[in-house]
From Swiss-Prot:
GO terms for cellular component: nucleolus; nucleoplasm; small-subunit processome. GO terms for molecular function: RNA endonuclease activity. Pfam families: RTC (PF01137), RTC_insert (PF05189). InterPro entries: RNA3'-term_phos_cycl_insert (IPR013791), RNA3'_phos_cyclase_dom (IPR023797), RNA3'_phos_cyclase_dom_sf (IPR037136), RNA3'_term_phos_cyc (IPR000228), RNA3'_term_phos_cyc_type_2 (IPR016443), RNA3'_term_phos_cycl-like_CS (IPR020719), RNA3'P_cycl/enolpyr_Trfase_a/b (IPR013792), RPTC_insert (IPR036553). As part of the small subunit (SSU) processome, it plays a role in 40S-ribosomal-subunit biogenesis in the early pre-rRNA processing steps at sites A0, A1 and A2 that are required for proper maturation of the 18S RNA. Activates BMS1 by promoting GDP/GTP exchange. Does not have cyclase activity. This is RNA 3'-terminal phosphate cyclase-like protein. GO terms for biological process: endonucleolytic cleavage in 5'-ETS of tricistronic rRNA transcript (SSU-rRNA, 5.8S rRNA, LSU-rRNA); endonucleolytic cleavage in ITS1 to separate SSU-rRNA from 5.8S rRNA and LSU-rRNA from tricistronic rRNA transcript (SSU-rRNA, 5.8S rRNA, LSU-rRNA); endonucleolytic cleavage of tricistronic rRNA transcript (SSU-rRNA, 5.8S rRNA, LSU-rRNA); ribosomal small subunit biogenesis. The gene is RCL1. Keywords: Nucleus, Ribosome biogenesis. Belongs to the RNA 3'-terminal cyclase family. Type 2 subfamily.
Amino acid sequence: MATQAHSLSYAGCNFLRQRLVLSTLSGRPVKIRKIRARDDNPGLRDFEASFIRLLDKITNGSRIEINQTGTTLYYQPGLLYGGSVEHDCSVLRGIGYYLESLLCLAPFMKHPLKIVLRGVTNDQVDPSVDVLKATALPLLKQFGIDGESFELKIVRRGMPPGGGGEVVFSCPVRKVLKPIQLTDPGKIKRIRGMAYSVRVSPQMANRIVDSARSILNKFIPDIYIYTDHMKGVNSGKSPGFGLSLVAETTSGTFLSAELASNPQGQGAAVLPEDLGRNCARLLLEEIYRGGCVDSTNQSLALLLMTLGQQDVSKVLLGPLSPYTIEFLRHLKSFFQIMFKIETKPCGEELKGGDKVLMTCVGIGFSNLSKTLK
């Protein structure tokens, strides 16, 4: 295994997931110092510790050292093993926090991954499971990750602060990834959505749908928003409601937006009408930003392009989010790869905001964990 000399060193608690995921894929150890060192409550938070435990479950032979105060972490990655795993996520963050990283790692396991995650399915901070199902899964399919065993299923919903949700994610393994050419975002052809309500009146979901449609109907007739009212044990432990919207384009691109109500006992109560209208506006804003991948999944697309065969991949993105910009810096540190970035100013055709064309040659990453049959 690599020695401490090869390890990368970082300071601070930001982008912890990016660093650990890229460390696992590249096999380079990472040392992170000064994790909230000056905070009143220093060190790793519960949800970060839970994430490290999850990495430990899906890998074989990882070495994790955390000091007494939790302010320094040394991670020496093992091999991605996969198999059947269960994990109780921290209710401080959504399941999306954990799932985003699993989507990056799952195709490179030794055995196909089948994981049950329990916790908060929809919150105001992380991408909800609904949005990841509607946008990230089709993106992975573009890279050739597909099959009957590729699914993400919501068994129970759970809202903060109590949680109680449950999702099942299964993903096949791939030896190599296909290069992609996603340069034509296409035009919006349909909008689909999911209005959910748990432990409140089912009427809430209908009120959300009506208000969201009142805005979106001005632009396109093909809108269908499903209502999902889970009852009993399937509704988790806390009341709440929310909406996720996904716009599909003629070239198979998915752009998403979502909103959830305030957690029980925190902040003012949100009117379902306001939530529906605001979510519809967020979707219009995402469509304005445009690109072939929505802002939630920019970093996932760039990672899979990096790990592809030694061939050119291109993707047209909207404005890069700060998270994606930092991710590009990390890709350079871990994989020594740099993207060619061309700005494409919006023309006269009312195509929305300025776009960025990202081009790279894959490093020809071969799944070392997967044994040859």
